[in-house]
C-alpha cells in the first residue's frame, strides 16, 4: 500500500510540473490577444493618437511584408458610425470600430493577403457622420515599389455611402490623393471640416489623420 501511495505522489508531481508550463503558454497567448484587441480595432482618446501608438498596431501584425496601421482622430464635433471597409488588395482581421464619438480616435490595420502572393494593402474605410454625410479614408500600400508608391486620401461624401470599388477609384485616381512622402498634408474637406494627415513611404506604413472643425 505504501508503495502505491509513493507512486501516486510521484505521478501527481510530474503531472503538475508539466501542466504549469502549458498553463503559462495559454495565459501568455490570451494576454497577446488582449494586447492586440486593446490596440487595433480600439477607440482611444484623440489626444493620445501618436506615431508610437500606430507602431504598436504594426508590431501586433508580426512579420508581414506589406502592412499598415491607421489612426483617425475625430475632432469634428460629430459622432461617427462605421459603415464598412472595402479592400482592393489585402485584408484585415480587425472589425472596424463601430462608434467614434467626438474627441476619440479609431485604430485600424490592414495587411497583404496571407501566403506567397504579390499583393499590397489597399482599401477604403467609410463612416457615417451624425450629420448624415460620409467620411471616407483611402490607404494604399503597394507590393511593388518599382511601379507604385504609398498613397492616401480623405474626403466627405454627401449622404450615406458605403465603400466600394467605385469609391476607391475616385479617391485613388480622381480626387487628388496625397503621396505617402513622410510629410504632413492639410485639406479643407467642406461641410465645415478640415483634415491634417501624415503617411510614411515604407511598406510598413502608418497613416495618421486628424479631422477637425474648419
UniProtKB/Swiss-Prot annotation:
Organism: Actinia equina (Beadlet anemone)
Important in the initial contact with the lipid membrane (site feature) positions: 147-148
GO molecular function: channel activity; toxin activity
Signal peptide as annotated in the record: 1-19
Positions of the propeptide segment: 20-35
Annotated protein name in UniProt: DELTA-actitoxin-Aeq1a
Domains as described in the record: Composed of a long N-terminal alpha-helix and a core region rich in beta-sheet structures. Before the pore formation, the alpha-helix binds the lipid membrane, partitions into the lipid-water interface and stabilizes the monomeric molecule on the membrane. Finally, it traverses the bilayer, thus forming the transmembrane pore.
Gene3D superfamilies in UniProt: Cytolysin/lectin (2.60.270.20)
Record site: Interacts with the lipid membrane: 179, 195
Keyword Membrane applies: yes
Family recorded in the similarity comment: Belongs to the actinoporin family. Sea anemone subfamily.
Record keywords: Cleavage on pair of basic residues, Cytolysis, Ion transport, Membrane, Nematocyst, Secreted, Signal, Target cell membrane, Target membrane, Toxin, Transmembrane, Transport
Lineage, opening ranks: Eukaryota, Metazoa, Cnidaria, Anthozoa, Hexacorallia
Function description: Pore-forming protein that forms cations-selective hydrophilic pores of around 1 nm and causes cardiac stimulation and cytolysis. Pore formation is a multi-step process that involves specific recognition of membrane sphingomyelin (but neither cholesterol nor phosphatidylcholine) using aromatic rich region and adjacent phosphocholine (POC) binding site, firm binding to the membrane (mainly driven by hydrophobic interactions) accompanied by the transfer of the N-terminal region to the lipid-water interface and finally pore formation after oligomerization of monomers.
Amino acid at each position: 500500500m505504501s508503495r502505491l501511495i509513493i507512486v501516486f505522489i510521484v505521478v501527481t508531481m510530474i503531472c503538475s510540473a508539466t501542466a504549469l508550463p502549458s498553463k503559462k503558454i495559454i495565459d501568455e497567448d490570451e494576454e497577446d490577444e488582449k494586447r492586440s484587441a486593446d490596440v487595433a480595432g480600439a477607440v482611444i482618446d484623440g489626444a493620445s493618437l501618436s506615431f508610437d501608438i500606430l507602431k504598436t498596431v504594426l508590431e501586433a501584425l508580426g512579420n508581414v511584408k506589406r502592412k499598415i496601421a491607421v489612426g483617425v482622430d475625430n475632432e469634428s464635433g460629430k459622432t461617427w458610425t462605421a459603415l464598412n471597409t472595402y479592400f482592393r488588395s489585402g485584408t484585415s482581421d480587425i472589425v472596424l470600430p463601430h462608434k467614434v464619438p467626438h474627441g476619440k480616435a479609431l485604430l485600424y490595420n490592414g495587411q497583404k493577403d496571407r501566403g506567397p502572393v504579390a499583393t499590397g494593402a489597399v482599401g477604403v474605410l467609410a463612416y457615417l457622420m451624425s450629420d448624415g454625410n460620409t467620411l471616407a479614408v483611402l490607404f494604399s500600400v503597394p507590393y511593388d515599389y518599382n511601379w507604385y508608391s504609398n498613397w492616401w486620401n480623405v474626403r466627405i461624401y454627401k449622404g450615406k455611402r458605403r465603400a466600394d470599388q467605385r469609391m476607391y477609384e475616385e479617391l485613388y485616381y480622381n480626387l487628388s490623393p496625397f503621396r505617402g512622402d513622410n510629410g504632413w498634408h492639410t485639406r479643407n474637406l467642406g461641410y465645415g471640416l478640415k483634415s491634417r494627415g501624415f503617411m510614411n513611404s515604407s511598406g510598413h506604413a502608418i497613416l495618421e489623420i486628424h479631422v477637425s472643425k474648419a
